[in-house]
Amino acid sequence: MNNASRRASASFLEGVRTRGVLLLMPSAKASLDDSAYWSWCLAAGFQEIGVPVFSNESSSFASRGITVAAAPEMIHDDTMVIGDISAIESCNSECVTLARRVFERARRSALLCMSDVVSSVDFPDTAPVFVAHSNSRIFARGRRIPWAFGLSREVMDKIAGAHRLQVRERLFLRNFRPSGNQSVRNALDLSFVKRLADKMAIDTSFDNHGRWNSDYFDRLGGSLGCLAYGGHFVEDFFRREEFRSQIGERRILSDEPAIDRWDSWRFWESLASGCVTVALDFDEYGLQIPVKPVNGVHYVGLRLDRLEDAVALLSGPQTPLAVIAENGREWVTTHYAPAPVAHLFLETMERLEESQ
């Protein structure tokens, strides 16, 4: 199937438009932070394609400029129910209760989880779970559907309103804030970034204004490229005999270290801003999303054993880089803007229903 045409059937879409989608999440206190990002993206996308949206926490959506109706007292059997448990680390008991509600309903229901720890969480097989950071080399139980951070309507509006230079500065942004469990960034600082800095200007400054501030999008709009990788290395402890009884089963399906927690907002924002986006090679490291970009066409993918190739490309002639940047911008807005993501979600749900 052509990825650009991944949409639910007309009859399925009409049914969802008739009964709507109920987005459930933990308390408003927990859902006002960015853990509700996927719910915001889906709500905006559903509304753009004519699907009514309800929620038990409408204040979370209002905080991002999205108006949704309050959850009805009675939920029709044909209403699609989506539970967002991305805040599982900060409100575990609420998320467990919410997940049980979805699993008990089973029909036309699903969970969302973009938590940093989702790759280590096992789920029942009752309902599908759309998960971030999916890696073919990391095993966890459940009906797991690889999903991507993607673009919110708010982010797209801020990118559209950002100041853009007619000629971008020939530099790369490396603006990661220090944080835990980012061993991939640390390793590449010691190897790739040092090599690239010998040939290209790199802006390593970062701000402390929080996520999605206008200054950041202005910087993206004026820069040639952005380093947008992330994640941490995990290895197979099951290979060590004394750990096997504690682990129970093999979780890392590779003799080499795998990469977890690899997705980031920066990757999507960089692509949509028209930057040359530098990330890990999706195919080389088993990174999974519904529609994958092509290395060298939509982004520049790093292989840790071939960093010199990436340095040569990024420090070379600007015309090929400009083509990659424009291809990446077109790819991300085609597949990962709110409306395409909403269509893709419904197509996936219909396909899962048909397979049962």
Language-model-derived ranges and their functions:
Residues 315, 348-356:
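Short, hydrophobic alpha-helical segments
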Residues 311-312, 329:
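Amphipathic alpha-helical segments within well-ordered protein domains
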Residues 319-350:
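A charged, aromatic-enriched C-terminal amphipathic alpha-helix characteristic of glycosyltransferases
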Residues 3-295, 352:
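Nucleotide-sugar donor-binding catalytic core of glycosyltransferases
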Residues 274, 314-315:
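Long alpha-helical, hydrophobic tracts
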Residues 270, 299, 328:
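Hydrophobic, well-ordered secondary-structure elements that form the walls
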Residues 309, 315, 339-341:
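Membrane-proximal bilayer-interacting regions
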